[in-house]
Amino acid sequence: MAFFNLHLLGYQNSFRSKKRDKTEETNQKDPVPTRLPPIFSEDGNYSVHQNSHTKYHEAVRKVSLKTFPNQVFRVPLTDAQNFSFWRSNAAGARPEETMPWIQNPRHCLIKSAMTRFMDHSILNDRNFSLY
């Protein structure tokens, strides 16, 4: 905010301010508390860590967990992330199926203007050569 001549506001961390708060999204599906944790995680990272604590920390260190930007941040940080905020996080879901408005009919031009010009010139003048 220093570019608006507003000073003494403290350190601004724009990335952290846009990050999702995990406490606001926790909703208990099962009102009865279970004694054991779930075997399969719902975040899609089970194939990476396979419920192993050491494999999980290694995946965190190597940043190989499959998290999407819309799972981490509330709003897109860059313009390139806008598309990932529209997409669903379901595995195997194609964007054309979930958002049919992104499909566009293709009208292919089989012969370009230069190709048509060359065909027309060759038919009219047998001695015509481009070179």
UniProtKB/Swiss-Prot annotation:
One Gene Ontology term from the biological process aspect of the record: flagellated sperm motility
Subunit structure: Microtubule inner protein component of sperm flagellar doublet microtubules.
Protein name stated in the entry: Sperm microtubule inner protein 11
InterPro entries given in the database record: SPMIP11
GO annotation, cellular component aspect: axonemal A tubule inner sheath; sperm flagellum
UniProt gene name: SPMIP11
Keyword rRNA-binding applies: no
Organism: Bos taurus (Bovine)
Organs and tissues of expression: Expressed in sperm.
Keywords for the protein's UniProt record, in alphabetical order: Cell projection, Cilium, Cytoplasm, Cytoskeleton, Flagellum
Location of this chain's protein in the cell: Cytoplasm, Cytoskeleton, Flagellum axoneme
Residue ranges, annotated region (Disordered): 17-44
